[in-house]
């Protein structure tokens, strides 16, 4: 059995964490070793970087600083969690990965795709997710869900135009490589989204055991 790297992507309020946990439970029913993690974060050091990235500050943060912090946390996460788990044959379910960088720092902040790609290759080498689930929903729906959770983090405080750009970046990436991406309608009820995940389960299990 080989390791499998699955990432879950989408804007604020898309339900990635909830559905990551649901998918993990379904995979564990089949006896699979599943590792749950997230970005930014996933290790003690990377979680400290996450706090820097998400905490609002009077000083502000340059877009390039944000980008470099994201990849610094990712390098630690890969070395300490993701690569070792894949090497032992586990299924890694990660709440956000490099697609989020292309969406938020590329789409939202307007940084060049080429610059992100250079850092991606430097930090990850040839490692890319085997499957990416993109949870898509209208921006206003996602922001309303995020606001209902309580205090907004630094990204959640951005305006609608920022998140429209994030959404479009996700959709462009999903449409550009349909063999890797599965696009799910996250505006549906949770039960409907999870039925869509169940429909993907046989293919995921086949890849795990292939």
UniProtKB/Swiss-Prot annotation:
Binding locations of ATP: 10-17
Q: Pfam families annotated for this entry?
A: Thymidylate_kin (PF02223)
Identify the EC number(s).
2.7.4.9
| EC category | transferase
Q: Name one GO molecular function term.
A: dTMP kinase activity
Reactions catalysed: dTMP + ATP = dTDP + ADP
Determine if Kinase is one of this entry's keywords: yes
Q: Report if keyword Disulfide bond is assigned.
A: no
Query: What's in the keyword line of the UniProt record?
Result: ATP-binding, Kinase, Nucleotide biosynthesis, Nucleotide-binding, Transferase
One GO BP annotation is:
dTTP biosynthetic process
Residue ranges annotated as coiled coil are none
Listed under GO cellular component are:
cytosol
* HAMAP family from the UniProt entry: Thymidylate_kinase
Belongs to which family? Belongs to the thymidylate kinase family.
Biological role stated in the UniProt entry: Phosphorylation of dTMP to form dTDP in both de novo and salvage pathways of dTTP synthesis.
* Full protein name: Thymidylate kinase
Q: Which gene encodes it?
A: tmk
């Amino acid at each position: 059995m080989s390791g499998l790297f699955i990432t879950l992507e989408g804007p604020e309020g898309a339900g990635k964490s909830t559905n990551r946990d649901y998918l993990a439970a379904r995979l564990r029913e089949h006896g699979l070793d599943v590792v749950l993690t997230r970005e930014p974060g996933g290790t003690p050091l990377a979680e400290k970087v996450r706090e820097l990235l998400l905490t609002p500050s009077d000083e502000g943060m340059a877009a390039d600083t944000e980008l470099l912090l994201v990849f610094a946390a990712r390098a630690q996460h890969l070395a300490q969690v993701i690569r070792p788990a894949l090497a032992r044959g586990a299924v890694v379910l990660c709440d956000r990965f490099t697609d989020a960088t292309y969406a938020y720092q590329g789409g939202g902040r307007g940084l060049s795709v080429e610059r992100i790609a250079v850092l991606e290759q430097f930090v990850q080498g040839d490692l890319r997710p085997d499957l990416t689930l993109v949870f898509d929903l209208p921006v206003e729906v996602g922001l309303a869900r995020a606001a209902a959770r309580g205090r907004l983090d630094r990204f959640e405080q951005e305006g609608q135009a920022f998140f429209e750009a994030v959404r479009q970046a996700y959709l462009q990436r999903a449409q550009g490589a349909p063999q890797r991406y599965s696009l799910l309608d996250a505006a549906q009820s949770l039960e409907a989204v999870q039925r869509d995940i169940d429909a993907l389960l046989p293919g995921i299990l086949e890849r795990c055991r292939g």
